[in-house]
Amino acid sequence: MLKRARTAILSFLAAISLLVDGPLTATAEVRLPDATRAGFAEMLYRLDCGHSLANDESVWTPGENFGRSIEFSSTCWLIQRGKEWLLWDTGVPESALNDPKGWSTLPKLIVYHLDKTLTDQLAAIGLKTTDITYVALSHTHGDHIGNVRLFPDSTVLMQRAEYAWISSPDGPNDNVNQLKALARKLLGTPKHLRLLDGDADVFGDGSVTLVSTPGHTPGSQSLLVHLKNSGFIILSGDVVHLEENFEKDTVPSLNTDKAASIASMDRIRRMIATYKAKLFINHDKAQSDELKLLPAFYD
């Protein structure tokens, strides 16, 4: 088993090493945009990328809610900037559509269901997968990267630390090993891959900025979007799963670095204050149910 896992990792590394594109302007020292001078993205759409039922809420709220089930949303976001489009995460695999058994990253803990496909939602506003310039990944858990392979012509943006993590040898935690193996399978070998080292100004004008928020995974990131009428919006990724995490500084047990997670939450708090930004939390179903859904949009 260990030999097979090592062989799979080496094959993944060999394939990816041939495919990495040149970098965006992206380093740990890149400054976040000036709130008064940042450009604007035209539109921000929320896409329904699945929903899930977990059997123990305490995994996400340590010390509380033992054995209580909880439902999560899975959200993707689509951003228009001029003639270009950026897709933030790709959600649960389309193969899970209407499957009564669902799909899972960790079958003993959580099951995901899908009611509509990503491609159908794009088609509803006249887009094809080939119209998407960038696919930016908050991190590599399967419910966020399930459809990356539908976008072979898009440039995939992810943190170098995240790529290194899923490429690393297995450790003692079986859940983590399982998540990393699934990530390698779902990511495959993108034709265009850019590995980032920290924050990145995607379009060069401060309208859309990838923000390094490690902790949940080593290369987790969030997204800062600037819109003319809606102002600044932060798309959380999994820096938090629930508003309660943010309010209480609670870090889910399924996490790679608790201290880094708390530091990342603090960073998001500072950004909210600096930009007077709204925070949209990916998995918080109560919040997601109140947000606009494609074809409606934020501008």
Give the positions of each predicted feature.
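Bacterial N-terminal signal peptides
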Residues: 10-21
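Active-site metal-binding loops of divalent metal-dependent hydrolases
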Residues: 49-50, 90-92, 140, 161, ...
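Active-site metal-binding motif and surrounding structural segment of the metallo-beta-lactamase
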Residues: 100-158
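Cap/insert and terminal regions of metallo-dependent hydrolase folds
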Residues: 108-120, 222-224, 229-299
